[in-house]
Amino acid sequence: MSDFNIVGVIKVMPSDPEVNLDELEEKLKAVIPEKYGLAKVEREPIAFGLVALKFYVLGKDEEGYSFDEVAEKFKEVENVESAEVETVSRI
């Protein structure tokens, strides 16, 4: 089993309701730095057909781990309007 002990929930808003969420999810998974893990991805309907992706990213409670770093990587991906850390908690 891994030694991850915290999880950060990062909410990603696509730039448009027409964005292919499957493709966007794969692009976002590809930019998560190797030292992090991914527990799951959920889809959250927002309004007017817009759906947010919620990434449950695993990390360690030690220097060198920052969920803001992951959110910044997500913001660089095409078709991402915003990426914000919603919560961080121990697991």
Swiss-Prot record:
Alphabetized GO MF terms: translation elongation factor activity
Listed InterPro entries: eEF-1beta-like_sf, EF1B_bsu/dsu_GNE, Transl_elong_EF1B/ribsomal_bS6, Transl_elong_EF1B_B_arc
Species classification: Archaea, Methanobacteriati, Methanobacteriota, Thermococci, Thermococcales
Keywords annotated in UniProt: Elongation factor, Protein biosynthesis
Domain of life: Archaea
Protein name: Elongation factor 1-beta
Family: Belongs to the EF-1-beta/EF-1-delta family.
Annotated function: Promotes the exchange of GDP for GTP in EF-1-alpha/GDP, thus allowing the regeneration of EF-1-alpha/GTP that could then be used to form the ternary complex EF-1-alpha/GTP/AAtRNA.
